[in-house]
Amino acid sequence: MKKTLILLIKGYRRLISPLFPPSCRFQPTCSQYTLEAIEKFGALRGSWLGLRRILRCHPFHPGGYDPVPPVTKK
């Protein structure tokens, strides 16, 4: 599942993203953030973090630097 999601995001970045002007308000971009989150936290939690980030990426949010949170050990 994790590899499939990563492949889909990389495909989006390579094939679809270049067709549109850059519009992400964050650094790193939402697709890069989601890739890092999936690699760091796995498919389920990484996808959730990526979805939350994408939902915040709109004109009414200031954006800025928003890195993937660190892994916390319990």
From Swiss-Prot:
GO CC terms of this entry: plasma membrane
Domain of life: Bacteria
Stored InterPro entries: Membr_insert_effic_factor_YidD
Its membrane topology: Peripheral membrane protein
Transmembrane regions listed in the UniProt entry: none
NCBIfam families found in the cross-reference section: membrane protein insertion efficiency factor YidD
Family: Belongs to the UPF0161 family.
Descriptive protein name: Putative membrane protein insertion efficiency factor
Lineage: Bacteria, Bacillati, Cyanobacteriota, Cyanophyceae, Oscillatoriophycideae
